[in-house]
Regions:
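Acidic, glycine-rich loop-and-beta core segments that form the ion-binding/anion-interacting portion
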Residues: 182-227
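Hydrophobic face of alpha-helices
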Residues: 26, 125-128, 199
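Glycine-/charge-enriched secondary-structure boundary and capping motifs
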Residues: 2-14, 123-141, 154-159, 213, ...
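Glycine-rich phosphate/pyrophosphate-binding loop regions near the starts of catalytic domains
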Residues: 31-192
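Residue-level signature of catalytic and energy-coupling elements of molecular machines
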Residues: 18, 70, 183, 254, ...
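Buried hydrophobic packing segments
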Residues: 29, 51-54, 96-97, 202-205, ...
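Short helix/loop capping segments that flank catalytic or ligand/cofactor-binding pockets
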Residues: 60-61, 75-76, 196-198, 263-264, ...
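N-terminal amphipathic/basic leader segments beginning at the initiator methionine
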Residues: 2-40
């Protein structure tokens, strides 16, 4: 029985999915993905799965695999409005791999998921370029990913990104709450800006309530508001690994959603408290702008934004100088921001005290 061909019948392209545009995006991103390759990576882009030679883990006595999945939230809307896409890829790597390094794990590889309303090959390639550049900074390989076109669910210019990463740590070198002791120092590492959390509040306050334009020059920033908001999230992975190799690090805390105190509390054991002194640093002007424009209370800011601290290291008090020297050698702005105590006046695992400097 022969099939009847109906002129103008339905097709995938007519439904809004452009396979050829997707293929073009893959071709454009290949050169960037190659830059992330590690010796353990087998095969190339375009297979059904990314391959990583696990025999490389034989040098570990008891290797533990660490995994994390994350995205960059509504910061993607700033990128969309600004027409800048590569920085979002950088942000994605930071959000995923800096969660992995917290337990002492070395980042190994990552995969990404890019969801778009319509495939614009150059835009997708720019996002992947940023992911690849971030992977190089984190020391991991980009072994695969997925670009999904969702016409009807997303507008033609809309997109979102997510990623998953894997790392490895020797079992007896796993960092965390069980290593923390009274008297340990809390070392803060400076953030590059807002990073990738709190953008729903920031967008609401600055763009909706404040009526500010992303192209507006902001004197305190020395650049436009949009450029400030798109400042890439700092990637601390290799800095933390270097610190772990040279110093007796007890724990790390990646300051993301929920703010400094809430994330620090996640690694503080029962019976101990982390006391962080606000007077040891001055938050960047962007935090003050958000607070002033929206009349946002300090506690609300601190529950939502990083307030200038992107990563915390907890080390023995006697290791403080060595830790700060290692970070300084790597160009990381860091300082002693507090201590671990067993005093019971604070009911939560971490608390901010005092007032910010400046």
């Amino acid at each position: 029985m022969s099939e009847t061909v109906v002129p103008g019948g339905a097709s995938y392209a007519a439904a809004g999915v452009d396979i050829e545009a997707g293929d073009r995006a893959v071709e454009l991103m290949k050169e960037w993905v190659k830059k992330t390759q590690r010796p353990e990576v087998l095969g190339g882009l375009g297979g059904f799965a990314g391959l990583f030679d696990a025999s490389a883990l034989k040098r570990y006595e008891r290797p533990l695999l660490a995994s994390a999945t994350d995205g960059v939230g509504t910061k993607v809307d700033i990128a969309r409005q600004m027409g800048v896409y590569d920085t979002i890829g950088h942000d994605l790597v930071a959000m995923v791999m800096d969660d992995i390094v917290v337990c002492g794990a070395e980042p190994l590889f990552m995969t990404d998921y890019i969801c778009v309303g319509k495939v614009h090959p150059e835009r997708v390639a720019a996002i992947v370029k940023g992911i690849a550049e971030g992977c190089v900074l984190a020391g991991c390989a980009l072994v695969g990913g997925e670009t999904a076109e969702h016409p009807g669910l997303l507008g033609e210019d809309d997109f979102d990104v997510a990623g998953a990463g894997t790392g490895v740590v020797e079992a007896d070198r796993l960092l965390g709450a069980d290593r923390i002791r009274t008297g340990d120092a809390v070392i803060a590492m400076a953030a590059s800006g807002l990073h990738s959390n709190g953008y729903s509040l920031v967008r609401h306050v600055l763009l909706n309530q404040g009526g500010l334009d992303l192209d507006a020059q902001i004197e305190e920033f020395g650049r436009t508001l949009g450029e400030e908001l798109l400042e890439p999230t700092k990637i601390y992975s290799l800095d933390c690994l270097a610190l772990t190799r040279t110093t007796d690090v007890h724990a790390y805390s990646h300051v993301t959603g929920g703010g400094l105190a809430a994330n620090l509390a996640r690694v503080i054991p029962d019976g101990l408290h982390a006391i962080v002194d606000r007077s040891t640093w001055t938050p960047a002007p962007i935090f003050d702008l958000v607070g002033r424009t929206g009349s946002v209370e300090r506690l609300e800011l601190e529950k939502t934004l990083n307030m200038g601290v992107g990563m915390i290291a907890i080390v023995p008090e006697e290791s403080t100088d060595a830790a700060l020297a290692t970070l300084a050698d790597r160009g990381v702005d860091a300082w002693v921001a507090g201590e671990i105590t067993d005093r019971g006046e604070h009911t939560t695992g971490a608390a901010l005290v005092g007032d910010y400097a400046g």
